[in-house]
């Protein structure tokens, strides 16, 4: 089915996503928002005729529920997990065979991080599929893939003398209590 001009549910691709889940051992599906996670999980569950164990993981779920999903992942008891950025970092789930990113990844760094969740075996590369939600996201997905292939990172490099940190510090000092401007200037210069 063709990618629609608008929308963010990716409903058009759910049957193909389900087929990929059936073909792989464990699939991690990343989405950008909680509502996308809920909708995708619901759509996958609706067509889950084989009753594959599919779970949901995002920040609005009860911490106990998230821990249950994480424990099931650690036991290799799940075939798929639909997740937001809550599973971007942290524990490496070595038995994840495939990452599917639903919607544009919103940057090469995020894409690389999410692809890195899959396949920590030495003899095989990580596998990922990008599923744009609409035709405009096709371009974003292509740009993120190209940037990732080139090793480009879209996160600004940290550096000495970051002005945003300085401004936050000065604002914090100013809001906390009376201060001596000369002392603050000397602190900043040190």
Protein language model annotation of sequence segments:
Residues 1-176, 181-190:
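Helicase motor core with emphasis on the C-terminal RecA-like subdomain
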């Amino acid at each position: 089915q063709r990618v629609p001009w608008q929308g963010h549910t990716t409903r058009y691709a759910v049957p193909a996503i389900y087929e990929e889940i059936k073909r792989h051992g464990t699939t991690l599906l990343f989405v950008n928002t909680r509502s996308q996670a809920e909708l995708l999980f619901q759509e996958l569950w609706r067509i889950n005729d084989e009753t594959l164990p599919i779970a949901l993981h995002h920040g609005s779920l009860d911490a106990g529920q998230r821990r249950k999903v994480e424990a099931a992942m650690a036991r290799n008891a799940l075939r798929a997990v639909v997740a937001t950025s809550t599973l971007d970092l942290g524990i490496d789930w070595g038995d994840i065979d495939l990452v599917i990113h639903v919607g544009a990844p919103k940057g090469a760094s995020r894409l690389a991080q999410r692809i890195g969740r899959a396949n920590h075996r030495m003899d095989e590369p990580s596998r990922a599929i990008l599923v744009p939600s609409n035709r405009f996201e096709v371009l974003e997905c292509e740009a993120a893939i190209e940037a990732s292939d080139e090793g480009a990172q879209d996160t600004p490099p940290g550096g000495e003398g970051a002005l945003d940190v300085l401004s936050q510090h000065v604002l914090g000092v100013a809001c906390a209590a009376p201060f001596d401007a000369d002392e603050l200037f000397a602190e900043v210069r040190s």
